Amino acid sequence: MNKKRTVDLIHGPILPSLLSFAFPILLSNIFQQLYNTADVLIVGRFLGQESLAAVGATTAIFDLIVGFTLGVGNGMGIVIARYYGARNFIKIKEAVAATWILGALLSIVVMLMGFLGLYPLLQYLDTPAEILSQSYQYISMIVTCVGVSFAYNLFAGLLRSIGDSLAALGFLIFSALVNVVLDLYFITQLHLGVQSAGLATIISQGLSAVLCFYYIRRSVPELLPQLKHFKWDKALYADLLEQGLAMGLMSSIVSIGSVILQSSVNTFGAVIISAQTAARRIMAFVLLPMTTISASMTTFASQNLGAKRPDRIVQGLRIGSRLSISWAVFVCVFLFFSSPVLVSFLASSTDSYLVENGSLYLQISSAFYPILSLLLIYRNCLQGLGQKILPLVSSFIELIGEIAFVVLIIPWAGYKGVILCEPLIWVAMTIQLYFSLFRHPLIKEGKEILATKVPS
């Protein structure tokens, strides 16, 4: 195994190892966001505001599909990380074999569900008639090739589960650049329309998947299963499926709530849809360090769970929380002053109504980012500890809250109700996750071990 690329999360100082592991994930996430942002910028500049709104109207559905595949990949990676922490390489190979089989089956299921329900779902979301056709063209391309997204997330999740977050980075950077080039070529030269933005994204993700597999085969072949490892192990398949579906469903529940919320946004017209789209893209970028630190905590907690180091899990939890809160405070101040410029740039518009509403969304929601930072850390730590139900409970709180806002608040509060919806729900979710995490036996044990240690 390539030790130079693999970060040791079980031994040594926590802060350097956590940052070394998290930084490549951060860069990977940045370039992953560039897939979507390139679509927004290029579509907005070359196809116009109506096409931009068509892409924006599918954001929640896109997040639902991609979030599910990413969640499944990361969830199964948690199981592999636990075996890696225990240095059980035979079990790792058996787990990898099982993830490939399960990933292929889930890809087929998601694709069939998409084919059957995509157009009715867009209609249910009150997608404006003038952009409905373009929205369907864009998102149907993503759904058709959902297996590509599954493949990449499974391979990348495998590398990250063993502490190798650097390997996939170079592949993803290359693919992001290819995505931008293809976007420009398909739209400006071939004039293929809005669906070509989805095609460019799929081709780019496919390149990432192929390069990830090639790297694993050449550099860490000990992770690849042989034919003998493709065997039925009920307990292993159940563990992988439960953990993968738990994280996939958690992402899906969040996205379903976003889909419901998007239905309210769509009723405000194309200008508000464009404002919301631009603001959400900016939000996704500025939250990347927080989501990266919390995602790193999942692997960190899982590996140290396998190594039986509860004290180290608690130390990592404290360090991760401080890092995440610090970034959240910085972003809150930054967005308060820079939101109008950023929204105008990303939406490719100087429309005062659009810029005002997009800026208001960012300025209000960012005030709650410190709370969101703890929410993400607590939830990912619970997932790393193998908890499946408690993180799901927080997602159901979010879903119920968004339904309540759509039914009771937004009809009379207007777009300001949309803006306040998620921040207020974050507060309730964080309270539930706090008590769930700090009542966990391993966290209590870790705190007791640290309390008995003599400070050096």
Could you say what each language-model-derived stretch is?
Residues 1-22, 80-145, 191-245, 301-368, ...:
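Short alpha-helical transmembrane segments in multi-pass integral membrane proteins
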Residues 11, 15-34, 38, 61-68, ...:
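Residue-level signal for short hydrophobic patches within transmembrane helices
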Residues 20-39, 141, 152, 175, ...:
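Transmembrane helical elements of multi-pass membrane transporters/channels
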Residues 25, 29, 41, 78, ...:
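Transmembrane alpha-helix boundary and packing residues in multipass membrane permease domains
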Residues 30, 34-53, 122-129, 185-192, ...:
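Helix-terminus/linker motif at the lipid-water interface of multi-pass membrane proteins
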Residues 43-63, 129-134, 194-195, 236-243, ...:
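Interfacial/gating helices of multi-pass transporter permease domains
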Residues 52-112, 149-168, 262, 276-339, ...:
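Small-residue-rich hydrophobic transmembrane alpha-helices
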Residues 73, 141-160, 168-176, 197-212, ...:
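Short runs within selected transmembrane alpha-helices of multi-pass transporters and secretion channels
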